[in-house]
């Protein structure tokens, strides 16, 4: 039986539901910005669970399943050139934390692939680690896979380790066979032309010590990964991942802008279209998760991807800004699974436009130098010059080659590579003398000074010693007024950002010294105070008075305790199974993300708000205790899944209301919160909702703003506040009636115009052809006019009408009679092709179709092309 043609969204949902049915908790995708400071981006589905696998924290559930968005750029040059390399991909995974192991994981995987996804068993082959006889036996004896379809591979391919020491274990992979007719002789699972790996099962069963010895782990874990794009390729029967419904709509949108037909293009054009389709998925998610383009870290990854998009756009003839436009397609394609894309759409488009424009200016400068080089060259551009273009101006080598070829010249690639190698050597030599970044400097300082002691739970002011001082990430001995610095103290009352709560603000003072502290972060065990010296000189070893801004701290405390009350109210009113997925506790607001498959209703939100304000009014005392984590769990304390906890934990208890593990600062009594108000509730990812709220003085500030808006509306509508709703409803009904009347008038006008146009039809053979532009007619009226004209012209009538009802927008309509359709002309296909001239597309039925475009300046060209094409097609 052939594999069912499931959509990418259906494959994802089927996978997650399957494992929910096997006792796994569905968890949302983590951000592309990982909590692990050693990793630049989230590169695998297991990364959010790495602390659990390494034994650094205890799992809150025994089984979990996720669809994790990931980014990898290590094979970026292969993107678009192979069937399966990507920068952005989704990794479907099922995980066991000390629960089931090899036998169950293999059985689950086989059941899912063969019974649920209905992939024929004869199309599958598996690999095991060469020494893993247990897995081999399970596949052969319990699953029934023939020995000839099981291949033993070495540690390079089939043994996972987190590092030279620590948890590790063998892997087993399921491969899809595109050519089973080739048989099993000489089976080579690494043959990419025949096999594709679709499912990887990692069995974490050993601990490796410094001597390389393996000992069995007490708790064995399972980590699996199924590439969504790869499984979509298999189930949808397409030749590569790019032609699945997960990516191809983006490629089609790019092709429309470039006026290209993907199916008939050369391989080089297809590569560029695939690169753009892939990278647009990556950059939209990176920006949505808070990354901005820069020359460092994640920002550089984003900048590089955007520039590759622009470069490949130019290679296929796109000579205008287009990334923000294509982002609309990417967002529309993925927003159902990742609602934050829609919420961040404006920011995504703005960042893309800004970075694209910056790169286009860079290219423009490079093109001027290239023009000079072309004029001076006889047969070849020197490699050193091409490298200057690349290194100094950011001008891609491929673009230099393309332009040179147009002039009949070549580029000295060997010279370019030599210049590149020399630059790498210079960079490596320079790196040895460069001062370290903040993180690197602190790692070095950790060998010399003790971690910061936090005294801020009880003290708002403390005398402390400056143990380290950094300026622009470099360790210095002193800094002066005007310098922006990072300061490490031996102990501090300043809370460092963690657990969703922002870092404290305040001042450091000394003799003739004032340092304004704007933020505090925790790095390598140190509390790093970020601020600016307003007066005086600060030196390592100085004694300073550290004082937090008490007003800011009180607001943060109120918001943090209110967040705990919010989670308790959600569990009480909506669903006991709700769990925290993230939070923000700022001075002016709070945000709480939680796992929930549906929206919280307005009535539930009202009940939640009322319940929290009731708890506030009841003036519950807050009890803070430090206890063993096992004791806390036994008492029913709520922990956030995925958060790191030590053996001893801090418990915040509002007796009878809430008990949570938390390291943040809180009010001593709920009455100190004052008031609580929900601002909004929305989805941020599949199965994840977000509530934003204010507490304490911020409620009054929020209500004052709302009150000012209501007063302004009352003045505008000359109505009392309580009458505004009725007044707006009346205006909406009036507007609706006016719009209906306007539409009718436009239709009458279009019909009147169309009646006058009948005489302008021209005979082509035995057909009557009418192609015209109507001014200011909307889509509905244009369609009515086209239908009426075609009916008047008869069965052999062909009508194409165009209009630009809004600035920059184009509407096109085609109406064909039966005799025209009999000649092989179909309105949908015809008008869709014409619309490409205006940068758009569309379609419809053979007899009537509508299309749109984005470039009104091309409307005359489109109308002329429509007439020419109709004449040619009908005459032939």
From Swiss-Prot:
Top-level class of the enzyme under EC nomenclature: ligase
Organism in which the protein naturally occurs: Synechococcus elongatus (strain ATCC 33912 / PCC 7942 / FACHB-805)
Domain comment from the record reads as follows: Consists of three domains; the N-terminal catalytic domain, the editing domain and the C-terminal C-Ala domain. The editing domain removes incorrectly charged amino acids, while the C-Ala domain, along with tRNA(Ala), serves as a bridge to cooperatively bring together the editing and aminoacylation centers thus stimulating deacylation of misacylated tRNAs.
Task: Please provide the record's keywords in A-Z order.
Answer: Aminoacyl-tRNA synthetase, ATP-binding, Cytoplasm, Ligase, Metal-binding, Nucleotide-binding, Protein biosynthesis, RNA-binding, tRNA-binding, Zinc
**Keyword set includes Zinc:** yes
Q: Which InterPro entries match?
A: aa-tRNA-synth_II/BPL/LPL (IPR045864), Ala-tRNA-lgiase_IIc (IPR002318), Ala-tRNA-ligase_IIc_anticod-bd (IPR018162), Ala-tRNA-synth_IIc_core (IPR018165), Ala-tRNA-synth_IIc_N (IPR018164), Ala-tRNA_ligase (IPR050058), Ala_tRNA_ligase_euk/bac (IPR023033), DHHA1_dom (IPR003156)
This enzyme catalyses: tRNA(Ala) + L-alanine + ATP = L-alanyl-tRNA(Ala) + AMP + diphosphate
Name the job this protein performs: Catalyzes the attachment of alanine to tRNA(Ala) in a two-step reaction: alanine is first activated by ATP to form Ala-AMP and then transferred to the acceptor end of tRNA(Ala). Also edits incorrectly charged Ser-tRNA(Ala) and Gly-tRNA(Ala) via its editing domain.
Q: What is this protein called?
A: Alanine--tRNA ligase
* Pfam families the UniProt entry points to: DHHA1 (PF02272), tRNA-synt_2c (PF01411), tRNA_SAD (PF07973)
Q: Name one GO molecular function term.
A: aminoacyl-tRNA deacylase activity
Q: Which family does it belong to?
A: Belongs to the class-II aminoacyl-tRNA synthetase family.
Recorded name of the encoding gene: alaS
